[in-house]
Amino acid sequence: MTRIKRGYIARRRRTKLRLFASSFRGAHSRLTRTMTQQRIRALVSAHRDRGKRKRDFRRLWITRINAVIHEMGVFYSYNRFIHNLYKKQLLLNRKILAQIALLNRSCLYTISNEIKE
């Protein structure tokens, strides 16, 4: 059997790993085995939190809309507001409604008055 020389392949792999883990603390940025484990964990967390971020923003938008609706003194809740929007076929998603609630409350007042039963 002839000897196989791998050359720089492993060194290149570890260099890429070191660049990825350079911002980690302690041994997680110095030791190759712990760097590898921490990299896997970081990528798992990133993947999980991409889905979580979508849920968090939706919760934030709903909270903002609900707060403005209650501040207006309207006698119906957030879910009744959304239900009336769908019945009147107004295509405004929660993100846009939350921006309107923050930046232009009078516009949201007129929308709520239009969709009132």
Swiss-Prot record:
NCBIfam families linked to this entry: rplT_bact
BP-aspect Gene Ontology terms: ribosomal large subunit assembly; translation
Species of provenance: Nasturtium officinale
UniProt record similarity statement: Belongs to the bacterial ribosomal protein bL20 family.
Gene: rpl20
Major location (coarse): plastid
Alphabetical UniProt keywords: Chloroplast, Plastid, Ribonucleoprotein, Ribosomal protein, RNA-binding, rRNA-binding
Molecular function terms from GO: rRNA binding; structural constituent of ribosome
Phylogenetic classification of the source organism: Eukaryota, Viridiplantae, Streptophyta, Embryophyta, Tracheophyta
Name by which UniProt lists this protein: Large ribosomal subunit protein bL20c
Compartment annotation: Plastid, Chloroplast
GO cellular component, as recorded: chloroplast; ribonucleoprotein complex; ribosome
Described function: Binds directly to 23S ribosomal RNA and is necessary for the in vitro assembly process of the 50S ribosomal subunit. It is not involved in the protein synthesizing functions of that subunit.
